[in-house]
Amino acid sequence: ITHRKEYRYMSTSNWEDAKARSNYHFNKWHKDTDCVEHLGKFTGGWQTELQSVIEDAKPLNWGNRREGTGRENTNVNVEAEENDLKTAGADPKMTIYRGLKDFTKCPTLQRMTDYFEMSPVSSKLHTQFTGEVLNMHIDKLYDLDADSDNVLRIMVMLQDWEPGQFLMYGNEQFDRWRAGDIHKFDWPNIPHATANASNKPRPMLVITGVMTDKTRGILAKPIKKKV
């Protein structure tokens, strides 16, 4: 499916607008088992440098999550996004996660980003501290390429899973990951959410970009890479 780069909001709800664009079934009683696409694993010793920057990540909400990305005003309707939280009785300015894009002190994260050979590409350390919640939504990356099939979003889990940490894709709960595990999902269609009810921060690297032929070659087989 080819999506246009731009679209207009059809409602005052980001969630309802996203549902109208998606081909997901939205049947909560149908048990999803195939929403998470496992790509392989990075190995290496990044824990010390990760710990040195985890406190540097800036708390973000729906309104400021794109600051410094160059996509601040693209496919964004903060009012509709915040309306979903208000309707649910939540604080529309609540912290949804903490973001860090400066990898000067954690060069391994830059090597992970570069490994996938995407162009253009951006990445950020996406950390949730205890009590932080990113409510159900569907991503809006249509501005990156005229054909959404060329746009890839990859998650690298940076520390072992702790009970109370979860990512939800569709209605499939993703947990029990190990440090270095890599996955992706069908971002134009799959609703997802993340939360941390554990007693430790949950860091992951989110890499987003346009695939090249080299990227497709890398994804053609399971990843086993020391970084």
Roles of regions detected by a PLM:
Residues 34-37, 120, 151-153, 204:
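Intrinsic-disorder/low-complexity, polar/charged segments enriched in Ser/Thr/Lys/Arg/Asp/Glu/Gln
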